[in-house]
A protein has these predicted regions:
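Paired acidic/hydrophobic, glycine-rich loop segments that form the ligand-binding mouth/hinge
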Residues: 68-73, 88
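Short helix-initiation/N-cap motifs at beta->coil->alpha
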Residues: 50-63
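Extracytoplasmic/periplasmic solute-binding protein
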Residues: 1-24, 67
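Long, aromatic- and glycine/proline-rich binding clefts that accommodate carbohydrate-like moieties
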Residues: 90, 138-186, 192-193
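Glycine-centered hinge/linker elements that transmit conformational signals in sensory
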Residues: 5, 19-52
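Short, well-structured alpha-helical segments that form the helix of a local strand-helix-strand
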Residues: 62, 200-212
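Extracytoplasmic/periplasmic substrate-recognition and gating elements
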Residues: 38, 81-143, 193, 198
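Beta->alpha turn/N-cap motifs
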Residues: 55, 71-77
Length: 218
């Protein structure tokens, strides 16, 4: 829901001057956030969205040709190709005049401090995982663009890579701060309340209060 929420004026956390996220600035109940909540309620009342359409239902509906589009990421490509769906990847179009942002993330490898063979683990990560062969294999397995430039250059013409790249241009880094873990459950519950007829402003206001409380508790 974040792309639609952001297009309607909402945000999760504000940002400091240096671009880092400010956990003290929760935007779920900001003016834009509450306006977004009301719009979600309107869409629910019009039958455009439903709490019964889970992520899995969305994927199945698109894979079977019952839905014209799916808002998802590279991890879903395999399901669509396996189903024989003829599809393209494009940025989400404007919503109510606003540009949807997507959360952009990266994946990497970390070595455990409790590794029984730290030297071997380091060698595996640096000398094996950090090769074009492995980077390209990870791309083929998960449709994620490689971070290694020499590997990326070999797949940069892939229409899927181009599509996700274009979508990422209007994206924002997913907050990688501890406070983000306090957001998901309360925010998800607020959407469920809206989709079952609760007052949208109250739902998001209460969710924001819960999030602030969780952050304060640490």
């Amino acid at each position: 829901n974040y792309p639609l929420f952001s297009a309607l004026g909402g945000y999760v956390f504000g940002q400091n001057d240096d671009g880092t996220y400010n956990a003290d600035d929760v935007g779920i109940d900001s003016e834009g956030g509450l306006a977004a909540a009301q719009k979600f309620a309107d869409w629910s009342n019009e039958g455009l969205i439903s709490k019964d359409v889970s992520y899995d239902v969305m994927i199945d509906s698109f894979s079977s040709g019952k839905a014209p589009f799916a808002i998802t990421g590279p991890w879903a490509v395999g399901s669509f190709t396996d189903a024989g769906v003829n599809f393209v990847v494009e940025p989400i179009p404007p919503v109510e005049g606003g540009t949807p942002e997507v959360f952009v993330g990266v994946q990497g490898f970390m070595q455990s401090a409790f590794s029984e063979n730290p030297d071997l683990a380091t060698t595996f990560m640096v000398d094996y995982l950090n090769t074009e062969e492995v980077q390209l294999a990870l791309y083929e397995a998960g449709n994620r663009p490689p971070a290694m430039t020499s590997a990326y250059d070999q797949v940069s013409s892939d229409p899927l890579i181009l599509g996700f790249g274009a979508a990422g241009q209007q994206g924002t880094p997913q907050p990688a701060i501890p406070a983000m873990s306090s957001v998901w459950d309360s925010w998800k519950d607020a959407y469920s309340l809206i989709f079952t007829g609760s007052d949208p402003v109250t739902a998001f206001t209460d969710a924001a209060a819960q999030i602030r409380s969780k952050i304060a508790e640490g």
